[in-house]
Amino acid sequence: MSLLEYKILSSEGNKALPELEALVNHAISEGWEPQGGVMASEANISDTSFTTYLQAIIRRLP
């Protein structure tokens, strides 16, 4: 049985999706694998909308 390391990447703001793509691509280059799909969370505070995108990633340990 292999051990797994688990991490959640997140980004928010005007360039959230391109930023998350860059984070995920960098993680993939370091041996991480996306786990499941992207999650989007939206919050409204004082008439300001914030969207946060999240991606779970795993890495198999020796």
Residue map of PLM features:
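Terminus-proximal functional modules
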Residues: 1-62
